[in-house]
Amino acid sequence: MFRGVATVSLDSKNRLVVPARYRDALLVNGAGRVVVTADPGQCLLLYPLPEWEPIEKKLTALSDFNPRTRSLKQLLVGYAHDIDMDSAGRVLLPPMLRKFAELDKNVVLVGQGSKVELWNEARWEAQVAQALSFSQEALPSELEGFTL
């Protein structure tokens, strides 16, 4: 289970040093084998391999006849990269994925249960500002009655 937010720096070889709390979960759930893919929100999604496999299976079963479904499948499955975390807990992010998410030196990791989102720092700050600007009237219907 991934939760919490952490900011980390890519090293000189564009490797992401996974924080210990996430690293331990990745080792337990997938032996350090991860899948990193693009998200429509222009961040990256990092899944332990066992968490990604059922998602990929569902995606590839979708019809290509619906253009929106096909586009989403192309994005999520097309950009997916299998990556092994090294013994120092680092993940080498492929150039195409770094470019997609506009990742530079600082990367924000956001735990989201079964996955971790990887954000460009400025884009993450904009995402937080947008989340804070919601009014009670603008909440999606699925959140009606939800309390913290």
From Swiss-Prot:
NCBIfam families: division/cell wall cluster transcriptional repressor MraZ
GO MF term (any one): transcription cis-regulatory region binding
GO cellular component: cytoplasm; nucleoid
Signal peptide residue numbers: none
Superkingdom of origin: Bacteria
GO biological process: one example: negative regulation of DNA-templated transcription initiation
Location in or out of the cell: Cytoplasm, Nucleoid
Subunit and partners: Forms oligomers.
Protein's name according to its UniProt entry: Transcriptional regulator MraZ
Domain SpoVT-AbrB: 5-51, 80-123
Biological source species: Thiobacillus denitrificans (strain ATCC 25259 / T1)
Pfam families: MraZ
Keywords for this protein: Cytoplasm, DNA-binding, Repeat, Transcription, Transcription regulation
Classification via HAMAP family: MraZ
Main location: cytoplasm
Family as reported in the entry's similarity comment: Belongs to the MraZ family.
